[in-house]
């Protein structure tokens, strides 16, 4: 064999070149391969979509690379634009080993499952001289890193072909060559999309009835079509009893500001002894709804072509003149939820809603509910109403919460009241939908709902809201003479100083999170758990509530007024204002005035101005002389005005242009559906010629017209329930919130989330269910059963002075790793929270990395 033996010349030449190379390297070290250093750490992995310019580095297949010039999409090692700097390591404590070899190529790449937006893959494991630490799945210019020999790729496009390859990676950062490519075409949607129902509002219960004419009442986006160019609802309750026949001021259909309203609710019908909707005898000439006439008023003459007289005759006439204004019959109210007033003015304790919905043993009285619902449809058809409003006060499990005269019916039925209430509203929804389809006329279902967290704690999570076109929140009567705590009737916000909440240490109890819950803003956010903003209407009172003999507070606010002669059933109460400070009072069963500080706003305006109204003797005020001065106060945090008479120590909570204007602005800002008014007859105008020419305030429409002017210029209300898009793929689950304790036992609130798998996919251990919960509760969630319940994000934390900041908390429940839920099976999860909520809503479930929206279909 020939062997080259170097000559002296060749040796000298080699030494010279070696010296030159060393000198050159000392001057230009950057051009030497990085492998001369054993501590090179890998840069970020090369990304096909990233732009790299001269000198920028990236790692690829366990090597470090530097770009020589501008590049994008050119794979290192396949183009001269990249310079190989040598082996690198992803672990600073484990420097690269130049002798390491890449893992073997993954084999047997196959599909195990696919949907419209996901593909599940598996492959055989790679081997390596060190250790395989993971794999990277490449597909259509995307990648996903995993640690196991399987992966679920999500967020794909339906009916699209993808090419998948897999590469293995070891603990030295080296990557194998790609597996054989696998082409997969995604399916169409996992569940066929629900057929679009034109005009039906998002979240409104689907009764299954076909051909419901939603588009009569709603536009294509599910927003209600509103009269008088208003962008938000203005709903006025018109009461039957201000007929003028008792010598007091009348308020008839002709006095309603029709051009400033979108809806009129007639108050009240009742549940009669046969469980039917009734307004009394149609043949009784003194019946305000059907028999009375007012020939002394030329604008209130009867239409003789109609088969009835009274308010209904006038409503029918004026409805023809104002066809866009919807009229609804309201059933119940405080006095007629558990009974009714007969033609002689006597209250008949029939049981009303309580016995109609719930049997004595707590079971649902479905037969009576069916009778009532059928009669409701008949009533709407006969008297030309466009819907029914249920004012049931109250189907709560809180003991002795409604009218004391109704406790004989409510107390033995507490455990079944909410179940019966849910059955009532569901049955009404179905019956009304059937009638709508038959008549080609859309019939609405609404309720008047309590707003106090105390009452709502006994109404579970208010699942019945889904059956409603909208809810009217009675965000008033938040303070009154039923207890001693002097405060505003209808504050918009909490101020952190509420005397009742301080008494019961609500602000300082950590579990409550500092949340004050006796205000309109809290009640609105409570409803958001089940309904979008546009299906919620906040309530405003056109009447006062007030106290006398007030001690402490600032101009009476947050003082105390302890009562001595409490109404039947109450052992403690407040000292409600009487006499000239209570002209709209109720009477007890003995005909005695009940102190409540209840007055129309027009009377409150006269008190504020020092005017003794000309109407006072008509209300039984024998000596109509004012004592002291009624000073107007206003708290901008609460958004609440009030009158304070220091001489009499009288506090009257009021509303006026400043507070109503602020509440209208709040409605607009938050995308809320509108405002509900109790009651229209309390609004005011100034009449300069009344009161013997001295002028006075009396029945008018100042506040209602102010609302209308603001809503004319507003944007349409918010018709969407969630700002976060839900996944396109859906999984059929039934999720129920059950197992609530009764009344005062329901604290902490600890129901069971019952999850039933109605899909054909097994819910594997470790799957995660997420949902939104309204910020009416604090951001504290746990489980009594050891279940994994965690807060993902908080919509609000801390006190809510001036209002809650967000709408929803996001909560996650994780299925135990050792547990799976096969199709048709159920699992129960314990949840604990502290302040009432409606909902939850916006459910999703993630199974093996794939996220689905939840549908109950």
Describe the role of every protein-language-model region.
Residues 64, 242-243, 602-716, 737:
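Extracellular low-complexity, Gly/Ser/Thr-rich intrinsically disordered linkers
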Residues 126-139:
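Solvent-exposed loop/turn segments flanking beta-strands in beta-repeat/beta-sandwich domains
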Residues 276-302, 395-597:
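Substrate-binding surface in catalytic domains of secreted glycosidases
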Residues 816-857:
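Terminal connector regions
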């Amino acid at each position: 064999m020939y062997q080259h033996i170097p000559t002296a010349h060749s040796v000298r030449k080699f030494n010279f070149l070696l010296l030159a190379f060393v000198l050159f390297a000392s001057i230009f070290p950057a051009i030497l391969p990085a492998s001369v250093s054993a501590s090179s750490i890998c840069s970020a992995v090369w990304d096909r979509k990233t732009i790299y310019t001269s000198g920028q580095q990236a790692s690829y297949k366990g090597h470090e690379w530097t770009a020589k010039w501008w590049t994008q999409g050119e794979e290192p090692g396949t183009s001269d634009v990249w310079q190989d700097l040598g082996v690198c390591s992803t672990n600073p404590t484990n420097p690269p080993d130049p002798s390491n070899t890449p893992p073997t190529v993954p084999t047997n790449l196959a599909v195990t499952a696919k949907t419209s937006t996901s593909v599940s893959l598996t492959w055989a494991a790679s081997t390596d001289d060190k250790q395989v630490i993971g794999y990277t799945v490449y597909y259509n210019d995307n990648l996903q890193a995993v640690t196991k020999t399987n992966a679920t790729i999500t967020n794909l496009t339906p009916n699209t072909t993808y090419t998948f390859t897999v590469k293995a990676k070891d603990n030295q950062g080296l990557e194998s060559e790609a597996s054989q490519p696998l082409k997969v075409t995604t399916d169409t949607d996992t569940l066929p999309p629900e057929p679009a129902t034109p005009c039906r509002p998002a979240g409104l219960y689907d009764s299954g009835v076909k051909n419901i004419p939603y588009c009569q009442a709603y536009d294509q986006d599910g927003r209600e079509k509103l009269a008088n160019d208003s962008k938000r609802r203005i709903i006025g309750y018109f009461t039957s009893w201000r007929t003028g026949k008792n010598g007091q001021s009348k308020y008839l259909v002709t006095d309603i500001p029709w051009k400033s309203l979108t809806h009129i609710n007639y108050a009240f019908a009742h549940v009669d002894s046969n469980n039917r909707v009734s307004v009394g005898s149609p043949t009784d000439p003194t019946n305000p709804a059907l028999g009375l006439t007012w020939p002394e008023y030329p604008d209130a003459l009867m239409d003789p072509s109609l088969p009835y007289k009274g308010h209904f005759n006038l409503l029918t006439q004026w409805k023809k003149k104002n066809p866009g204004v919807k009229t609804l019959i309201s059933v119940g109210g405080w006095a007629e939820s558990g009974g009714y007033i007969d033609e002689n003015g006597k209250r008949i304790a029939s049981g009303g809603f309580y016995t109609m919905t719930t049997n004595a043993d707590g079971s649902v009285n479905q037969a009576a509910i069916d009778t009532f619902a059928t009669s409701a449809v008949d009533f709407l058809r006969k008297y030309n109403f466009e819907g029914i409003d249920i004012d049931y006060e109250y189907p709560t499990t809180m003991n002795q919460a409604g009218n004391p005269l109704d406790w004989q019916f409510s107390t033995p039925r507490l455990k079944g009241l909410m179940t019966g209430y849910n059955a009532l509203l569901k049955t009404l929804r179905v019956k009304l939908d059937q009638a709508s389809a038959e008549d080609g006329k859309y019939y609405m279902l609404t309720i008047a709902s309590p707003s106090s967290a105390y009452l709502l704690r006994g109404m579970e999570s208010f699942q019945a809201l889904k059956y409603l076109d909208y809810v009217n929140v009675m965000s008033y009567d938040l303070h009154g003479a039923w207890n001693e705590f002097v405060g505003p009737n209808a504050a918009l916000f909490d101020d952190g100083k509420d005397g009742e909440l301080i008494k019961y240490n609500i602000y300082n109890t950590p579990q409550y999170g500092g949340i004050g819950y006796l205000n309109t803003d809290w009640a609105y956010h409570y409803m958001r758990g089940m309904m979008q903003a546009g299906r919620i209407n906040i309530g405003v009172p056109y009447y006062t509530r007030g106290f006398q003999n007030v001690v402490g507070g600032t101009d009476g606010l947050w003082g105390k007024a302890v009562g001595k002669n409490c109404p039947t059933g109450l052992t403690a109460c407040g000292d409600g204002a009487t006499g000239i400070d209570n002209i709209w009072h109720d009477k007890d069963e003995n005909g005695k005035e009940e102190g409540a500080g209840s007055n129309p706003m027009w009377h409150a305006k006269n008190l504020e101005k020092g005017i003794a109204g000309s109407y006072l003797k008509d209300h039984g005020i024998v000596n109509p002389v004012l004592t002291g001065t009624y000073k107007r106060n206003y708290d901008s945090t609460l958004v609440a005005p009030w009158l304070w008479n220091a001489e009499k120590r009288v506090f009257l909570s009021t509303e006026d242009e400043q507070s109503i204007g602020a509440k209208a602005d709040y409605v607009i800002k938050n995308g809320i559906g509108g405002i509900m008014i109790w009651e229209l007859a309390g609004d005011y105008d100034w009449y300069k010629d009344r009161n013997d020419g001295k002028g006075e305030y009396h029945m008018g429409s100042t506040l209602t017209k102010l609302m209308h002017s603001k809503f004319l210029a507003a944007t349409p209300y918010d018709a969407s329930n969630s700002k976060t898009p839900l996944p396109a793929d859906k999984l059929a689950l039934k999720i129920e919130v059950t197992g609530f304790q009764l009344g005062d036992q329901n604290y902490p609130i600890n129901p069971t989330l019952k999850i039933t798998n109605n899909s054909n996919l097994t819910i594997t251990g470790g799957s995660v269910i997420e949902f939104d919960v309204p910020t009416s509760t604090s951001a504290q969630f746990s489980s009594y059963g050891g279940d994994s319940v965690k807060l993902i994000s908080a919509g609000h934390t801390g006190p809510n002075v001036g209002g809650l900041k967000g709408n929803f908390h996001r909560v996650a429940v994780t299925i135990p790793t050792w547990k799976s839920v096969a199709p048709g099976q159920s699992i129960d999860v314990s949840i604990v929270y502290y302040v009432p909520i409606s909902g939850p809503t916006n459910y999703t479930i993630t199974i093996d990395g794939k996220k689905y929206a939840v549908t109950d279909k």
